[in-house]
Amino acid sequence: MREIVHIQAGQCGNQIGAKFWEVISDEHGIDPTGTYHGDSDLQLDRISVYYNEATGGKYVPRAILVDLEPGTMDSVRSGPFGQIFRPDNFVFGQSGAGNNWAKGHYTEGAELVDSVLDVVRKEAESCDCLQGFQLTHSLGGGTGSGMGTLLISKIREEYPDRIMNTFSVVPSPKVSDTVVEPYNATLSVHQLVENTDETYCIDNEALYDICFRTLKLTTPTYGDLNHLVSATMSGVTTCLRFPGQLNADLRKLAVNMVPFPRLHFFMPGFAPLTSRGSQQYRALTVPELTQQVFDAKNMMAACDPRHGRYLTVAAVFRGRMSMKEVDEQMLNVQNKNSSYFVEWIPNNVKTAVCDIPPRGLKMAVTFIGNSTAIQELFKRISEQFTAMFRRKAFLHWYTGEGMDEMEFTEAESNMNDLVSEYQQYQDATAEEEEDFNEEAEEEA
């Protein structure tokens, strides 16, 4: 079967990673000891994508937990599903990265990276046919961003033909841990542009706004934000974990979603939005779900899709519903908002339906959009980066670990290039292409 090896790095990565395993274990009927107690063959049909079947019929996540300090991993180990993970797959240092990208990427992280790669090899060897890797991490800290991107490039070297997929939490001043987040995030994006095939941008700004505005939580905690993240991660991996036709593996998803190699930053969305522990009173209809999931308020990246255009879209509907109605509603959205979809990629909206809904909901839909509006997120980070960098504020923490200012300048310009590329395709029309071809013919 086509397996995926999951890696979680740093505090944020381990917290959202642990939530992800709680949610999908529940969906597949697997309890905290790794024993199956499910009620449907669909749950086991593709279980081997994310789980290894060990002796005694126990299912063990193909997960590797990495951090430069023991704290977060101790709390994962003592958390609700802490005993399900393979004990050898906890790899941690003692020093911490102190929210410093350079420590994660060049010094402390570089010392630990070989022991992580040993575990990665061991997991990859037990796979029948490895399709790729997924990493959960944040871009604002030191370990997830610095060491996370180091791991990506090392794994890329060793497994160049496997898909690399990340769930990357983008920092925001509204939920900020550290003042140097813009530096860490820019240095990380510089790596992600080159070394990943698909990156889901999970934006703390958007998560905060959803909790505050939609769910009416006055002081959202990380627990509330992570509840949204785990619902989204469960949704975007549905096609990988349950039987179905569309985007059934990471490579097919990449082929459908990524028209140009650098533009692989996706905006996830989810509907209906519910707060932790709440029950849904009435099932939404398919038209309501479709309308909600295309709404800017339901996006997990703080970008307004109406400020850009969609290059490609994938939607995953979950629960028992009429396929015909789903197709009609999706066509309806495209016809009514045709200006928001680039016309030079016909049929750029794909829909999948899975019978098993998430826990506590009758129906739900997850949205994956490759929209040029994602440039707003990169612009936001870039502005914060430039404000500090032009005064060389806090730079000594990075140069002290052996980094050069040049690397900052390169990362800054790479991110600005990315923004211009998105803008270029936002402005491109099908007609321009024809003019372009005519010019080429004249020159020839």
Swiss-Prot record:
Name of the gene this protein is made from: tubb
GO terms, molecular function: GTP binding; GTPase activity; metal ion binding; structural constituent of cytoskeleton
Region called Disordered, residue ranges: 421-444
SUPFAM superfamilies: Tubulin C-terminal domain-like, Tubulin nucleotide-binding domain-like
Stored Gene3D superfamilies: Helix hairpin bin (1.10.287.600), Tubulin/FtsZ, C-terminal domain (3.30.1330.20), Tubulin/FtsZ, GTPase domain (3.40.50.1440)
Pfam family membership, one: Tubulin
Binding site for Mg(2+): E69
Subunit structure: Dimer of alpha and beta chains. A typical microtubule is a hollow water-filled tube with an outer diameter of 25 nm and an inner diameter of 15 nM. Alpha-beta heterodimers associate head-to-tail to form protofilaments running lengthwise along the microtubule wall with the beta-tubulin subunit facing the microtubule plus end conferring a structural polarity. Microtubules usually have 13 protofilaments but different protofilament numbers can be found in some organisms and specialized cells.
The record's account of how the chain is modified after translation: Some glutamate residues at the C-terminus are polyglycylated, resulting in polyglycine chains on the gamma-carboxyl group. Glycylation is mainly limited to tubulin incorporated into axonemes (cilia and flagella) whereas glutamylation is prevalent in neuronal cells, centrioles, axonemes, and the mitotic spindle. Both modifications can coexist on the same protein on adjacent residues, and lowering polyglycylation levels increases polyglutamylation, and reciprocally. The precise function of polyglycylation is still unclear. Some glutamate residues at the C-terminus are polyglutamylated, resulting in polyglutamate chains on the gamma-carboxyl group. Polyglutamylation plays a key role in microtubule severing by spastin (SPAST). SPAST preferentially recognizes and acts on microtubules decorated with short polyglutamate tails: severing activity by SPAST increases as the number of glutamates per tubulin rises from one to eight, but decreases beyond this glutamylation threshold.
Domain comment quoted from the record: The MREI motif is common among all beta-tubulin isoforms and may be critical for tubulin autoregulation.
Protein name: Tubulin beta chain
Main function: Tubulin is the major constituent of microtubules, a cylinder consisting of laterally associated linear protofilaments composed of alpha- and beta-tubulin heterodimers. Microtubules grow by the addition of GTP-tubulin dimers to the microtubule end, where a stabilizing cap forms. Below the cap, tubulin dimers are in GDP-bound state, owing to GTPase activity of alpha-tubulin.
